């Protein structure tokens, strides 16, 4: 993994608490990825309702990956898992026997070239963790899943404030574009496709 990028992306417990408070004030559900057991314990103290497992944790190559997965599993809370770097889905399912799991199709490139998406593979997953630019990929994924008859379609998209300089800013969409994407997805969800 690119440790410099990862370190720049890390948030402190203090920042997590601030973000949780802002989310609570705006009726937005807060959850995030935990990369070590102490982070899970801290997120539990914030009373998060679900967890996100990043692709690199699924590979079990980070120093505390296995312990972190087991800590999240003990919470029995819903868990979103990005499979962008691979990982053994069957093994991960064994770790989480009592959690509602959402496995997301993902390619861990920032930004991701639209042409690299394998739609046939993507629709085999419960959700889509998207790193492409723009709104096309999430809209296509939602349409394909809706056509399959899926009712609960999960989309993960990195967003930023205008002029943000964060490490994933080049592959993130601003809040105006995000709002347009949500409106398009809601139209698809309320359409009859089959």
PLM region spans:
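Catalytic cores and adjacent flexible loops of soluble metabolic enzymes
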Residues: 1-194
């Amino acid at each position: 993994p690119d440790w410099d990028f990862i370190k720049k992306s890390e948030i402190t417990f203090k920042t997590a608490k601030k973000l949780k408070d802002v989310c609570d004030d705006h009726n937005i559900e807060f959850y995030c990825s935990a990369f070590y057991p102490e982070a899970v314990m801290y997120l539990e103290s914030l009373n998060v309702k679900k967890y996100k497992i990043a692709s690199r944790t699924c590979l079990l190559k980070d120093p505390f990956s296995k312990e972190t997965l087991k800590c999240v599993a003990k919470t029995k809370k819903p868990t979103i898992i990005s499979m962008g770097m691979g990982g053994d889905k069957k093994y991960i399912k064994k770790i989480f026997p009592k959690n509602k799991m959402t496995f997301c199709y993902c390619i861990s490139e920032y930004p991701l070239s639209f042409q690299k998406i394998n739609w046939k593979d993507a629709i085999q997953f419960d959700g889509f963790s998207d790193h492409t630019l723009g709104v096309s990929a999430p809209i296509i994924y939602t349409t394909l899943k809706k056509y399959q008859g899926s009712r609960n379609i999960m989309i993960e998209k990195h967003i930023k404030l205008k002029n943000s300089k964060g490490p994933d800013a080049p592959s993130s969409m601003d809040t105006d574009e995000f709002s347009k994407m949500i409106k398009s997805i809601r139209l698809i969800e309320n359409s009859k496709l089959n």
